[in-house]
């Protein structure tokens, strides 16, 4: 590469403009400028010291300028943006008036925000000795005179640069300063120059007025590096706009505004395209002569379903409900009304879907003492539960809880026969592996409440809670981190006579996010923390410390092994003037930093980082005592693992900004930093060698206090294997920044750090040799008082480093420290591409209370192959008196569940780990498929299948592009995926039936893991743009049995021009993928549904049925049955397309009766709610019934009773009493209007319910009866007074004054509750699920009753609650009575279940290859047979670095004519040979004896081998024999000969020693 002479010395008047080619697109390199001398090649740069004024980092680009004599190489490397460049951008002109030569040239841009790139030439006939290329590094203001300076930012396209100087002191000039037009330089003129600078494209926004009505942004195209966006703001307001909303088959709302052209006065049109909605239901209420309010659901038409609610006009009948199960997906209700003259009950048929189980509850009395639920066997999907309510109350009950191997909780109550007075026995059987925990509370002389967990017995763990009987001690909490996923707490109680604090050990999981805190001063009065956004796993928090208060503060930061930062502030007591102390505890493994804040005369808060000692770094935060400067932050990336911040403060008299350098880690490199002190003046980072993504850096911190220099870090990559760091330090008098060059390898290394103590005075890092693993040894001084010396050197710890590599087996190497102390490192290499034919390895590291590190390898049990788990237990700092148990559950690729109990090794006591490996559902022998759906601006749906490249196997990606803003002119496709109990994936395409066009549905059935004994049916309903309802039944294909899918397509409100397609994917228990296309039936056009059934991993014995119901714009119901394809059996899918309909609503309202009374009654859904209006003076009654209500009954609530329950609640009685009573779900609640003076009643009822309520009567009484789905007194599966699993829990309320009772019940229960009685008593009682809850209102003076029922409520009942009772339980609670009573009842299901350990050990080393051979001979009839045994043992190392012992055993019978020997070899290697699994099979080898008997001879058999690849990771080995024995009378005999015998006579036996040459040739 060279720069050619481009101006002759005689061309003094030539002025030309350089134009750059428009195809330059690459990015601008970083670094300093390069000086290029005329005629020099790039390799000459470094050899010429006189030309080395500026660092040589990048080369001049290559392009053809206007003058063809000038050529610059590699122009694309210079430009800073990826866009075509207009030649008009490079027309700036530099004019030089004088004619002297110059050795160097610099230039400064017009402004710091220039946006153009300038290439200039000039009129001078002189030549510049050098051309300087600038890069964006340093911005120079105008008229700056600096030799060899850099230039960043470009000049304006129209700028003219003029150098007009009269100095004659230098010829040729050494420096030329080129400034803007009109400026004059102070140095010698003028050279020939070329200046090339680029900056990114900028965007300019222009706001203009236009006669439209909507503010619009018009985006311009890039021109000359600038994009001009025009924002049109309406300048007139005399018109509005018209919004036209349409539906389309997309997934997002599209808005298009059509502005006025300039002279219209009408409204502007805005088109809004919204996705097709789900079906809209309109309800009409009519009267009929029946006795039950019935909802008749109309067929869908154009997206709307009109439901007719029949309200009884007579009340003299009841009704009979018959509930049955069916295979649909929605609950169907059919009411058979009276014809007009019947007096018997009306029949209501309720069909509920399988596999959901319908439970009917019947309540009967019995002479026992405990409310018991007897669950009947399911019949046709219905379970009849009988609730036995005690009719006598003189006994208690005894609960016996045991575990058994079933899957549901069994409760058996042995009632009294009638005359007993003792307790009734309730037997509760809970399933394994769920563990039942029984808690016993005892007193002990300690100071901390401690839970002692007993050993499990038959599924039950008895926990003993020790409550301190003395209160004179405190406790000390020690929190450490460990690599588990849950928090472990261990309390060491007193033995009985101590008075000191009790120790509580808390082990918390290591965190994943590192938070760095920077402290700055500000003129406020409150310390504030500003949390930054996370970047690369790091969150930078800024703590603003007030500078206007009269005290400071001292922050002491220590590390602990928790996962969150703990901050404790010790405030002043009132008269101190010294600093306040703030204790900050930050989590490990981040280095612990202690921060001290001092004032200094600078302008920026600076953190000076001290050298680390014993895991602690003391940072000094300098807070400015003056506030007149700002600061400039420069952020760069580097290859470390933490964010480094360096602040260059002022020396005391500057007024400009202070510079803060922030170096953030690159995301792909992990860097470990060690800080040591040294006698220099600049903080220096020495990067150690390493590979595999871990690099250790040593930071040299000056031990002197001169910090007046900054530094510039330049990081580049190179092809070496270690990181090289070069620091150009100052010689002593410079004030500019120091340059640090860091060259990092393209592939980094894994570094393991071992910490030991030594007798020096500085913490030193010794880096080991490079390789796959680099071991750094950190020496910590223990003999110098200037450092914090650890009291003990930790021994026996283990550090595990896991890296990926391209092999096929997991390799584990244990690096043991030398000497007797230090960390043991376990390096685990796991394959990056896993072959499913071998065993995967998962390493789980847990902490335990022993003293040694225990490692156990857990292999899968049974016949499974798959993941092997290596459990590493590392000691914690606590010595426990008993054995803890930690359970770790991992997934692996096997087919059976494997459980291994890992006990501590050696003499340690402590934690026992139970490892449970559960099979995953992925079969690794086939290719996974991932589907990615994106939107694009095309008009058709594009599908591309991306298969893995090369020889890889694995995931295939299907990319589906769907149009976004384009009206669909072709067939839309909707994919619905459902699970079913088959074994194969079934796919069916459901197209619209009849003449409908619109959406096509693809139904994909994927297998589940359940084995079905009968045919399941899954119904999938989708909408499409047709006009008729289309139903298709998708049955499993092939020989599969399992789920059948019914696909129902219902019309939407839009008529499409073509056929939409909806895809429904379901699983089933078949073995093949079944695809069926479901078209609409009848004359409808619209959605076609494609049903795809995919097999599951379970083989079902019969065909399941899945029903899919979809809506479409047709007029008929279309049904298609989709069976599985191929030989699969399993799920059959029935696709039903139902039309939508549009209707109107009839909503009658009955007014209130009384004086000034108002009644509002809205009724929605299916309900029976008779209401009596309010009667009285100034009475107001609001009665609203809606599907969602305030006193909502929800299956989820806070004092929730979930599932099926009977809960009777008696309201509060007393003075100024307040009762909160909520009812939710399906209930019977009649309501009687309020009666009285100034009474107000609000009554809202929703869902299907009958809710009678008695209004408030009296003076000053207030009753709030609210039931909501979510509430404050919530019941949750994990709760404060939580009862989980199967339990019997009786609670007696507190007695006192001002009593408060919180009582929540959930799951299937019977919970009668007696209200609170007393003075100022408050009772909160919530009931939810399917219940019968009569409520008696409050009695008092001036009563106001608000009775609200809503789907979501404040006092909600939810399946997750605070005082929650989960599962099946019997919980009787007596309300609070008396004065100041408080009741808290907590039961939890969280337990520790120890398991008897099984000790397993594994050892590393070499495997042994056993080769067995059998010699079979053909015996000559009539001859004597002598058995001869041959044993050959060979030990060696094969080409795969596998040590083995090769043994051959055979038995030979003599005399013989034919000797046949067979060999079978299996080789197991201690390290993986490349990426293949090698085994071998020897072919049979035979040798023939040509005469009989055999005579004496001698010789050696030689064997050769050939290895052949058979295409499936197995090698076939074939061995051949050559040569033989010679001697005796038969010199031509081949085969086996006796080693010694008399000449010419038979032998009784022979001894044969064979030299076997074992040759393995690797491919």
From Swiss-Prot:
Protein keywords: Cell membrane, Glycoprotein, GPI-anchor, Lipoprotein, Membrane, Repeat, Signal
Subcellular location: Cell membrane
GO cellular component, one term: external side of plasma membrane
Lipid-anchored residues (GPI-anchor amidated serine): 1539
Topology relative to the membrane: Lipid-anchor; GPI-anchor
Gene disruption: observed consequences: Abolishes adhesion and invasive growth.
Residue ranges annotated as propeptide in the record: 1540-1563
GO molecular function: cell adhesion mediator activity
Chief localization: membrane
Residues glycosylated per entry: 224, 263, 302, 341, 380, 419, 458, 497, 536, 575, 614, 653, 784, 1510, 1516, 1529, 1532
Sequence repeat segments: 203-280, 281-358, 359-436, 437-514, 515-592, 593-670, 671-750, 751-825, 826-869, 870-913, 914-957, 958-1001, 1002-1045, 1046-1089, 1090-1133, 1134-1140, 1141-1162, 1163-1184, 1185-1200, 1201-1221, 1223-1244, 1245-1266, 1267-1282, 1283-1304, 1305-1326, 1327-1348, 1349-1364, 1365-1386, 1387-1397
Region (Disordered): 1135-1393
Any GO BP: galactose-specific flocculation
Region (8 X 44 AA approximate tandem repeats): 826-1140
Signal sequence coordinates: 1-27
Region (8 X 78 AA approximate tandem repeats): 203-825
Sequence segments annotated as region (13 X 22 AA approximate tandem repeats): 1141-1397
Family membership noted in the UniProt record: Belongs to the mam3/map4 family.
UniProt function note: Galactose-specific adhesion protein essential for non-sexual flocculation and filamentous growth. Required for adhesion and filamentous growth through recognition of galactose residues on cell surface glycoconjugates. Induces flocculation when overexpressed.
Protein name: Galactose-specific cell agglutination protein gsf2
Name of the gene encoding the protein in the UniProt record: gsf2
């Amino acid at each position: 590469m060279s720069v050619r002479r481009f101006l002759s010395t005689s061309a003094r008047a030539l002025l030309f403009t350089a134009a750059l080619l428009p195809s330059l697109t690459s990015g601008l390199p970083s670094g300093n400028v390069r000086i290029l001398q005329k005629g020099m090649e790039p390799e000459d740069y470094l050899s010429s010291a006189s030309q080395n004024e500026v660092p040589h980092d990048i080369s001049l680009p290559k392009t053809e300028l206007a003058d063809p004599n000038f050529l610059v190489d590699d122009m694309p490397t210079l430009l800073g943006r990826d866009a075509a460049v207009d030649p008009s951008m490079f027309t700036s002109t530099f004019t030089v008036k004088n004619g002297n030569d110059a050795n160097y040239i610099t230039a400064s841009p017009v402004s710091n925000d220039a946006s153009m790139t300038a290439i200039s030439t000039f009129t001078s006939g002189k030549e510049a000795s050098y051309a300087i290329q600038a890069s964006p590094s340093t911005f120079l203001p105008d008229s700056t005179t600096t030799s060899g300076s850099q230039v960043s930012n470009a000049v304006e396209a129209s700028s003219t640069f003029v150098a007009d100087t009269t100095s004659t002191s230098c010829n040729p000039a050494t420096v030329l300063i080129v400034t803007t037009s009109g400026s004059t330089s102070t140095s010698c003129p003028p050279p020939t120059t070329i200046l090339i600078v680029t900056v990114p494209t900028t965007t300019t926004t222009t706001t203009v007025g236009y006669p439209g009505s909507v503010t619009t942004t018009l985006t311009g195209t890039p021109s000359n590096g600038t994009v001009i966006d025009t924002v049109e703001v309406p300048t007139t307001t005399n018109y509005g706009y018209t919004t036209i909303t349409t539906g389309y088959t997309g997934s997002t709302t599209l808005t298009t505004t059509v502005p006025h052209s300039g002279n219209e006065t009408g409204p502007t049109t805005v088109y809004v395209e919204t996705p097709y909605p789900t079906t809209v239901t309109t309800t009409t209420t009519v009267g009929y002569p029946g006795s039950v309010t019935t909802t008749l659901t109309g067929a869908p038409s154009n997206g709307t379903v009109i439901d007719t609610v029949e309200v009884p006009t007579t009340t003299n009948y009841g009704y009979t409900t018959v509930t049955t199960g069916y295979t649909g997906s929605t609950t169907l209700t059919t009411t058979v009304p009276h014809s007009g003259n019947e007096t018997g009950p009306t029949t209501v048929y309720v069909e509920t879907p399988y596999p959901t189980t319908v439970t009917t509850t019947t309540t009967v009395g019995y002479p026992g003492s405990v409310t018991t639920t007897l669950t009947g066997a399911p019949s046709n999907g219905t379970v009849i539960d009988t609730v036995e309510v005690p009719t006598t109350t003189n006994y208690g009950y005894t609960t016996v809880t045991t575990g058994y191997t079933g899957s549901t909780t069994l409760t058996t109550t042995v009632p009294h026969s009638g005359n007993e007075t003792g307790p009734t026995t309730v037997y509760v059987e809970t399933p394994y592996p769920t563990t039942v925990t029984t808690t016993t509370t005892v007193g002990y002389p300690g100071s901390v409440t401690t839970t002692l967990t007993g050993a499990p017995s038959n599924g039950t763990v008895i926990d003993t809670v020790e409550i301190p009987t003395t209160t004179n001690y405190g406790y000390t909490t020690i929190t450490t981190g460990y690599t588990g996923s849950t928090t472990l707490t261990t309390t060491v109680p007193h033995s009985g006579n101590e008075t000191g604090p009790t120790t509580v050990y808390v082990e918390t999981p290591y965190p994943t996010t590192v938070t760095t805190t920077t402290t700055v001063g500000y003129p406020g009065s409150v310390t504030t923390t500003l949390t930054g956004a996370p970047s690369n796993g790091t969150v930078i928090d800024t703590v603003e410390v007030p500078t206007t208060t009269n005290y400071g503060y001292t922050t002491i930061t220590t590390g602990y092994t928790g996962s969150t930062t703990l901050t404790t502030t010790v405030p002043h007591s009132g008269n101190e003037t010294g600093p306040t102390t703030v204790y900050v505890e930050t989590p490990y493994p981040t280095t612990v930093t202690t921060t001290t804040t001092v004032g200094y005369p600078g302008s920026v808060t600076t953190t000076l980082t001290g050298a680390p000692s014993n895991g602690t770094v003391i940072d000094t935060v300098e807070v400015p005592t003056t506030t007149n400067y700002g600061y400039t932050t420069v952020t760069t990336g580097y290859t470390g693992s933490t964010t480094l911040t360096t602040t260059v403060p002022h020396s005391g008299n500057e007024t400009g900004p202070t510079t803060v350098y922030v170096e953030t880690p690159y995301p792909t490199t992990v860097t470990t930093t060690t800080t040591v002190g040294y006698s220099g003046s600049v903080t220096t980072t020495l990067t150690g060698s390493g590979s595999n993504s871990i690099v250790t850096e040593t930071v040299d911190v000056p031990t002197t206090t001169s910090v007046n220099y900054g530094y510039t870090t330049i990081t580049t990559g190179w092809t070496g294997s270690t990181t090289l760091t070069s620091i150009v330090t100052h010689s002593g008098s410079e004030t500019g920044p120091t340059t640090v060059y860091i060259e990092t390898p393209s592939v980094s290394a894994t570094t393991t750090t071992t910490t030991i103590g030594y007798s020096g005075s500085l913490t030193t890092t010794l880096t080991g040799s490079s390789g796959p693993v680099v071991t750094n040894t950190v020496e910590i001084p223990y003999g110098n008082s200037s450092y914090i010396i650890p009291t003990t050197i930790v021994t026996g710890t283990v550090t595990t480093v896991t890296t990926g590599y391209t092999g096929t087996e997991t390799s584990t190497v244990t690096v043991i420290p030398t000497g007797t102390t230090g960390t043991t490192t376990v390096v685990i290499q796991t394959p990056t591409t896993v072959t499913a034919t071998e065993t995967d390895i998962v390493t789980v590291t847990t902490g335990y209370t022993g003293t040694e590190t225990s490692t156990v390898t857990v292999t899968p049990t049974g016949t499974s192959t798959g993941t092997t788990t290596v459990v590493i237990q590392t000691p914690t700092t606590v010595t426990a008196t008993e054995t803890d148990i930690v359970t770790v559950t991992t997934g692996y690729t096997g087919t059976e569940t494997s459980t291994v109990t890992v006990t501590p090794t050696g003499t340690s006591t402590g934690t026992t780990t139970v490892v449970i490996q559960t099979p995953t559902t992925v079969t690794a022998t086939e290719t996974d498929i991932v589907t990615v759906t994106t939107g694009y601006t095309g008009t058709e749906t594009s599908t591309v299948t991306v298969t893995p490249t090369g020889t890889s196997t694995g995931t295939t990606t299907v990319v589906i592009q769907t149009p976004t803003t384009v009206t669909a002119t072709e067939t839309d496709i909707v994919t619905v995926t459902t699970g079913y109990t088959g074994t194969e994936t079934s796919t069916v395409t459901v197209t619209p039936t009849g003449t409908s066009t619109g959406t096509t549905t693809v139904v994909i059935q994927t297998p589940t893991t359940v084995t079905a004994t009968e045919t399941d049916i899954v119904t999938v309903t989708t909408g499409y743009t047709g006009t008729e309802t289309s139903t298709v039944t998708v049955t499993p294909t092939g020989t599969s049995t399992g789920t059948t899918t019914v696909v129902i397509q219902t019309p939407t409100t839009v008529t499409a021009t073509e056929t939409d397609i909806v895809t429904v994917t379901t699983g089933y228990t078949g073995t093949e993928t079944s695809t069926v296309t479901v078209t609409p039936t009848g004359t409808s056009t619209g959605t076609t549904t494609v049903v795809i059934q995919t097999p599951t991993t379970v083989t079902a014995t019969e065909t399941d049925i899945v029903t899919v119901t979809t809506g479409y714009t047709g007029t008929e119901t279309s049904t298609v049955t989709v069976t599985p394809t191929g030989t699969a059996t399993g799920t059959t899918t029935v696709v039903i397309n139902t039309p939508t309909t549009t209707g109107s609503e009839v909503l009658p309202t009955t007014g209130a009766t009384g004086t000034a009374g108002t009644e509002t009654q809205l009724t929605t859904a299916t309900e029976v709610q008779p209401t009596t209006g309010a009667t009285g003076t100034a009475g107001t009654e609001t009665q609203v019934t809606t599907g969602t209500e305030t006193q909502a009954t929800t299956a989820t609530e806070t004092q929730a009773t979930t599932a099926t329950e009977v809960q009777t609640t008696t309201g509060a009685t007393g003075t100024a009493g307040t009762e909160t009573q909520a009812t939710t779900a399906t209930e019977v609640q009649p309501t009687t209007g309020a009666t009285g003076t100034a009474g107000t009643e609000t009554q809202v009822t929703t869902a299907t319910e009958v809710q009678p309520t008695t209004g408030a009567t009296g003076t000053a009484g207030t009753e709030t009866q609210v039931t909501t789905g979510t509430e404050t007194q919530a019941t949750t599966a994990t709760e404060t007074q939580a009862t989980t699993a199967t339990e019997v829990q009786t609670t007696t309320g507190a007695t006192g004054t001002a009593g408060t009772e919180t009582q929540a019940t959930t799951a299937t229960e019977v919970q009668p509750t007696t209200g609170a009685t007393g003075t100022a008593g408050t009772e909160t009682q919530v009931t939810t699920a399917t219940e019968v809850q009569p409520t008696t209102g409050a009695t008092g003076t001036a009563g106001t009753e608000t009775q609200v029922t809503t789907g979501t409520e404040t006092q909600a009942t939810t399946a997750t609650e605070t005082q929650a009772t989960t599962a099946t339980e019997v919980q009787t609670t007596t309300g609070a009575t008396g004065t100041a009573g408080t009741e808290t009842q907590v039961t939890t299901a969280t337990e520790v279940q120890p398991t008897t350990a099984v000790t397993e050990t594994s050892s590393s080393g070499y495997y042994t290859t056993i080769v067995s051979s059998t010699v079979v001979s053909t015996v000559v009839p009539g001859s004597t047979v002598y058995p001869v045994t041959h044993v050959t043992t060979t030990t060696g190392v094969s080409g795969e670095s596998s040590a083995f012992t090769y043994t051959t055993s055979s038995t030979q019978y003599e005399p013989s004519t034919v000797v046949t020997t067979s060999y079978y070899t299996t080789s197991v290697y201690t390290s993986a040979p490349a990426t293949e699994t090698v085994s071998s099979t020897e072919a049979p080898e035979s040798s023939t004896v040509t005469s009989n008997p055999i005579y004496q001879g001698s010789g050696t058999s030689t064997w050769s081998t050939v290895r052949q690849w058979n295409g499936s990771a197995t090698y076939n080995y074939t061995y051949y024999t050559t040569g033989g024995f010679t001697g005796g009378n038969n010199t031509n005999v081949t085969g086996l000969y006796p080693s010694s015998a008399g000449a010419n006579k038979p032998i009784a036996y022979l001894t044969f020693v064979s030299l076997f040459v074992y040759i393995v040739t690797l491919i």
